[in-house]
Every structure is written in C-alpha cells, then in structure tokens.
Amino acid sequence: MNRKLSREKAMELLFGMTLNTDNCEETLENFIDNYESDIKELDITYIKRILIGVENNKDNIDESISKNLCNWKIDRISKVNLCILRLAVYELLHDEEIPNRVAINEALEITKKYSDEKSVSFVNGVLDNILKK
C-alpha cells in the first residue's frame, strides 16, 4: 500500500466533499466503486481515518488554521489549499502515528502538485506556525 498516494487521494476526496453534500462514508464508497486503478495500491483504512478525522475535528482544525494566518482570513484560502491544510493539521494535531515533519513535507508535495509555488510557501508558513505552538 502506498501511503503517499493514499494521502493524495484523501486530499482529493476532502476537496470533493467541499463541493457536494456527501458525508465521508458516501464519498469513500463512491470513490471505491469508481476507482479505475488497482485499489490494493491504496490504504483505504488510512483514507477513511483522514476523512472521518477531518470531518469530526473540522471546527478545531479550522480554528488552528485561522489562528496561524498572517493578514489572511480562512475564507480567502483556495479550496484546494484549505483541504491540504486541513489534512496536514489533522495529522499534526490528531494523528500520533504520523511524524510532524512527514505531515508537513507531504502537504508541501501535494501543494506543489495541485497548486502553485506561492501556495507552497503559504502552506509551509501556516503549518510551521502551528507546529511551533
């Protein structure tokens, strides 16, 4: 199972959940039913843990993000970057299995793939601020 790919798919699913009203169970079920590659490559248990964890802790996660923004408001963050931040903040604050540096580095790699260079610096700054507290 590929944790890096699983984390990326979890972010994509979180993004999808911001665009529709499906809960994490429905989102994951639809994803599994429609996934066209080898599902064995993915850690479905990990993806489910991320989706449920972010959904259950969203207020706390968003508060942590908001407190660590410099001259920004959370509603100004692009949906993609917000989903990346939510995933990483969940791992930093609520998932002891993932080392903090891994959570940050993986978030930055996902940001490079799905966003732009300015966003990489932005995401890194927010996550570093959260880690310092």
UniProtKB/Swiss-Prot annotation:
One of its GO terms (cellular component) is cytosol. It comes from the Bacteria. Keywords: RNA-binding, Transcription, Transcription antitermination, Transcription regulation. One of its GO terms (biological process) is DNA-templated transcription termination. GO terms for molecular function: RNA binding. HAMAP family: NusB (MF_00073). NCBIfam families: nusB. Belongs to the NusB family. Involved in transcription antitermination. Required for transcription of ribosomal RNA (rRNA) genes. Binds specifically to the boxA antiterminator sequence of the ribosomal RNA (rrn) operons. This is Transcription antitermination protein NusB. It comes from Clostridium botulinum (strain Eklund 17B / Type B). The lineage of its organism: Bacteria, Bacillati, Bacillota, Clostridia, Eubacteriales.
